Regions:
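Conserved "HGTGT" condensation-loop signature of ketosynthase/thiolase-family condensing enzymes
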Residues: 1-74, 95-97
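Conserved catalytic cysteine-centered active-site region
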Residues: 36, 40-52, 79-119
Length: 119
């Protein structure tokens, strides 16, 4: 049994925190962080929930793919930083999208995406 990815979507929280901003309250600097990680800034949730971001990304993926949420066969969410343990993030996303398919979460840290695809 195989699957096809017809579209992808992404969403980021509105607030971005620079390394310089971090250095105002942490003993660090932009140079120290950037030379070790390559990171200049990161997005942080202030008002958005994981569900909000997952739904926004899913809606974009559905738009790109040209299909309706009612046509989905399965929703798998991979995260280690969910808003809640129960119900699964994927179930909350399915409900907000109006999808009637099975939905569940995979928790495998950085490798989660790969394991979610392998399910």
């Amino acid at each position: 049994m195989g699957f096809t990815i017809l579209g992808t979507g992404s969403a980021l929280p509105e607030r971005s925190v620079s390394n310089d901003e971090l250095s105002e309250f942490l003993d660090t600097s932009d140079e120290w962080i950037f030379t070790r990680t390559g990171i200049k800034s990161r997005h942080v949730c202030t008002t958005e929930s994981l569900d909000d971001l997952a739904v926004a990304a899913s809606e974009r993926a559905l738009q790109v793919s040209g299909i309706d949420a009612s046509q989905l066969d399965l929703i798998v969410c991979s995260t280690t930083t969910g808003d809640h343990l129960v119900p699964a993030e994927a179930c909350a996303v399915a409900e907000r999208l109006g999808a009637a398919c099975p939905a569940f979460d995979v928790s495998a840290a950085c490798a989660g995406f790969v394991f979610a695809l392998d399910v």
